[in-house]
Amino acid sequence: MACRRRLLPCAGLGLFGVLCWVWVSFASFPDDQLPLEVFDTVDRGAFLPQSAFREMEFASIASYKGPGNTDGRSNKQLPILLWWSAGLFPHFPGDTERIDCALSSCLVTSNRKVQLYKRTASIIFYGTDFRAYEAPLPRLPHQTWALFHEESPMNNYFLSHAPGIRLFNYTATFRRESDYPLTLQWLPSLDYLLRPVAVSLEEKNRLRREGMAPVLYMQSHCDVPSDRDRYVQELMKYIQVDSYGKCLKNKPLPEHLEDTATATGEEPGFMNFVARYKFHLAFENGLCPDYMTEKLWRPLHQGCVPVYRGSPAVADWMPNGHAAIIIDNFPSPKALADFLRHLDENDDEYTRYLEFKNLKSITNTRLLEALETREWGVNDMSKPNYLNGFECYVCDQENARLAAERAHRKDPERNPPPLPKMASNSHMGCPLPSPGYGQVQDLPADDGWLQIWPQDYWQSLDQAEGLESLIRHNESDPSLLWRHIQSITERRARGKH
């Protein structure tokens, strides 16, 4: 299934990718029309697998090529892209398709039997599912690795360490520095921000006089790396907070909203309920530059003020300089509470935080340009979803690389080899988790957060170094990872690492 829980923005778009400027076309081809000998042999440096293509369904349909795509090759001549993660293949039906992208064409498949084929040019991984001890080894010199990771850094801290991220040649992550940035994945459009406020300030003030808290906290995912509950618990000492969900719950939700409380969608009844609050505590579960989710964009959409902690660079993407309240700008929870009370009691100053609802008040050109120029769309039938967009990016990059390699082999003096491409830590690298409030050295040894997240972060570094060692030694058995980690640890203890 292409769209997982956190891949909601791509839901329903697979059939419409043909309409976008990258002109993605999905084709299936009957396998019995393609004899085995048309496929390149495998890399015999490892082993000879059975033909994966005998089990693949193909059927010829019209191709929708982009204006820059002059690729006239038949399917038997195209490079292959292998989607490695089980259950994530952004096409249907079957497990193999042809894609015709902006500049070139490829075959894409989820059938792992093609892993060692020479025509398999790149393997695409879903970051949440990537495990060092399950990596496709040996890593072949003719293949690149591509990473798709739009989810929280907490899902896989392997990717936040340099030895891990630099194993990949192409990236699509929430970081703006990645090759195919997904930074605004939870912001469907500019119109989403401009939607009129759902509940008027007059109504919010009336509810406040009746005893409703000014601040909403809605969370059922507790014990996360950002340690948000620890901060909120301290904040509650200084200002009234209505907390729903499993974490720090002090008020019950109406029964009819219980099933939608943790949804990332926008069920009208739930949205109208939370829109009554002036301020929403918007804490990401992991802290990393450019990691921003619906927790930030949803209150802006509703006309509430997000009180935000997540991306330290969030101000770079706000509509203007006063659309969100950044928690890290305050020295303490008490100082933040004092400021929120001040806004609660001063309508004119509170209203300044909603001025972005007028298009003329959106002054952030970075935000406007990013929304205007991104190649993928969210619920936009004129653009591909970001899964299909990224695979087309990889397809075009790989065809360019392969063409440059052929030219170099033909005339090395006139055609230099293509430059090696490797992801850097800026494509993902997220910091060591820190306590939501206070200093790590002040936490008791049996603190639950302390026992989980710092350890998980550093164990992920061990695995990144271990996999890098496996690849460097041309190992074919990923289960040897633990032996390599032990060897690295011993060398480090002797001061030789």
Swiss-Prot record:
Reactions listed under catalytic activity: L-threonyl-[protein] + GDP-beta-L-fucose = 3-O-(alpha-L-fucosyl)-L-threonyl-[protein] + GDP + H(+); L-seryl-[protein] + GDP-beta-L-fucose = 3-O-(alpha-L-fucosyl)-L-seryl-[protein] + GDP + H(+)
Entry EC no(s): 2.4.1.221
Pfam family, one: Glyco_transf_10
Keywords of this entry: Disulfide bond, Endoplasmic reticulum, Glycoprotein, Glycosyltransferase, Membrane, Signal-anchor, Transferase, Transmembrane, Transmembrane helix
Cytoplasmic topological domain: 1-6
Annotated region described as Disordered, given as residue ranges: 406-427
Gene Ontology molecular function, alphabetical: alpha-(1->3)-fucosyltransferase activity; peptide-O-fucosyltransferase activity
Record's GO cellular component terms: endoplasmic reticulum; endoplasmic reticulum membrane; Golgi membrane
Glycosylated residues in this chain: N169, N474
GO terms of biological process kind: fucosylation; positive regulation of protein secretion
Top-level taxon in the UniProt lineage: Eukaryota
Lumenal domain ranges by topology: 28-497
Topological relation to the membrane, as annotated: Single-pass type II membrane protein
Pathway: Protein modification; protein glycosylation
Described function: Protein O-fucosyltransferase that specifically catalyzes O-fucosylation of serine or threonine residues in EMI domains of target proteins. Attaches fucose through an O-glycosidic linkage. O-fucosylation of EMI domain-containing proteins may be required for facilitating protein folding and secretion.
Family: Belongs to the glycosyltransferase 10 family.
Protein name: GDP-fucose protein O-fucosyltransferase 4
Organism: Oryzias latipes
